[in-house]
Amino acid sequence: IAIERSRGNSKRILRLNMFVIILKLSITAYFIYGLNADITMIAVASVISQAFLFVMAIHNLCSGNDAFTFSFKSIRFKKNVVNPMLNLSFPVIVEKVAFAMGKTVINSMSKNYGSVTVGALGISNNINGITTQMQNGFQDGGASIISQNRGAGNIKRALGTFWRLVIIEASLGLIMYIILNIFAGPITYLFANSQDGYNVEFQNMIIKVFRYDSLGGCVPLGINAAVMALLFGFGKTKLTLFCNF
């Protein structure tokens, strides 16, 4: 995905991701409703869909004649090549691992309020993720544009891109906050309805958690994504690690 993004093939990334999502949903539906399989087969569906993405990645990586085409002859593990990559990547790796661990700790702490709260928190995070995933897409694209302008010495345009990105991210967060809260009932109904029947208590808990989660997530996280795009574009990954901690 990183190579395709560097090539500027955002449409190819979109097509691949959409196909993987459709493939995973189709296989999962077949396993559950067609074969009446257990929950383990959901993981199998994920493996199959990700395996397809892996095969396509290898194919796209080895095809073409541009600078990003994979070649064993071009592989060099020299310090001037590896060190900058590690210096930029390591803080990002630590940041993402710490973020994942933080979510795990929060979910673990919520066990004191009962299993219903834990489930509601997880579902609320998934619903809120609809907004954050879109914002992350703008973040990735914005970081690339800022980095390109910085490399070309056009700092003014790079900063202009950042301020435009702030407006886009905040506006997107506000719009999605309104939409998701309006349709919170129908969305959460899908999660509160199971083989055991409709659980109104569980749905109300999901909505209650989501109200606060979205209030502190949609717009603020959008602005945060714009700031992260600016820092990534200028190569300040150590600063992003400090800010997120």
Can you say where each PLM-predicted feature lies in the sequence?
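Short membrane-interface helical motifs at transmembrane helix boundaries
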Residues: 175-200
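Hydrophobic/aromatic residues within transmembrane alpha-helices of membrane transport systems
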Residues: 4, 9, 19, 31, ...
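Interfacial/gating helices of multi-pass transporter permease domains
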Residues: 39-44, 80-88, 109-129, 161, ...
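Interhelical loop/hinge segments that connect adjacent transmembrane helices in multipass membrane
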Residues: 43-46, 55-99
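Small-residue-rich hydrophobic transmembrane alpha-helices
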Residues: 1-13, 120-184, 221-235, 239-243
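Alpha-helical transmembrane segments of multi-pass membrane proteins
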Residues: 1, 15, 197-227
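Membrane-interface helix-loop junctions in multi-pass transport and translocation proteins
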Residues: 11, 21-55, 186, 238
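Hydrophobic alpha-helical transmembrane bundles that constitute the permease/transmembrane domains
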Residues: 3, 7, 18-26, 47-55, ...
